[in-house]
Amino acid sequence: MVALRLIPCLDVANGRVVKGVNFVGLRDAGDPVELACRYSREGADELVFLDIAASHEARATLVEIVRRTAESVTIPFTVGGGISSIEGITELLRAGADKISLNSSAVKDPGLVSRGACQFGSQCIVVAIDAKRRLEESSGWDVFVNGGRKNTGLDALSWARKVVELGAGEILLTSMDGDGTQKGYDLELTKTISQSVQVPVIASGGAGCLEDVFEAFEYGNASAALLASLLHDQDLTIEEIKNYLLKKNLIIRPTNY
């Protein structure tokens, strides 16, 4: 069995890491490269950078952050946010990113997923899905884009299956209801998607304690857990989380590996 992964998430705006609750109320959380180095030293398995500004000016800043990070850490990292072309993918991969995350651009142009997978390999293409539980009594989740501001009307499960067919090698699944709340991952959402696709699913949105991370793996069937507030606020370290999961008999790469 492949080892389960812990992945710190760095939301970047104007060259700084920021964090909010339910996609709003952003606050400064530090320098992205410094945090990347810290998490790498602590034993993170991978990193994710998401450019939430995604403007033309911000892109140059992001490319520089990617270059500096690639020079400073040896663990794989994914970059996403406003990437809408093969040229954009190429630029960030050349700067040192290992994977590219597509979100709104995949909904607008699904062919970008298949073109990216064809040119760079499925292992390079991650599709990020921001899902929000429907208010009606009917079950299911809607896919949102544009930083969680626009409901596409797409069903999250159907969309997850579609992007895998198109060539996505991984899904970054964020529960908008749980994002930044530290009240636990949406286990039903995570399990539903994880059991329905044949690629790894990264659980995102809501980790607040050790038990939450364990449950994402044990009950949500996630392949990886994305962590933000829990680490940025230094409530827990990656080593503490990994030691806890190892005691729970999960297959995790030790921090002293």
Swiss-Prot record:
Keywords: Amino-acid biosynthesis, Cytoplasm, Histidine biosynthesis, Lyase
GO cellular component terms, A-Z: cytoplasm
Localisation per UniProt entry: Cytoplasm
UniProt-listed Enzyme Commission number(s): 4.3.2.10
Catalytic machinery residues: 11, 130
Primary localization class, coarse: cytoplasm
GO biological process terms on file: L-histidine biosynthetic process
NCBIfam families: hisF (TIGR00735)
Entry's family note: Belongs to the HisA/HisF family.
Known partners and oligomeric status: Heterodimer of HisH and HisF.
PANTHER family, per the entry: IMIDAZOLE GLYCEROL PHOSPHATE SYNTHASE HISHF, IMIDAZOLE GLYCEROL PHOSPHATE SYNTHASE SUBUNIT HISF/H IGP SYNTHASE SUBUNIT HISF/H
HAMAP family: HisF (MF_01013)
Protein name, UniProt field: Imidazole glycerol phosphate synthase subunit HisF
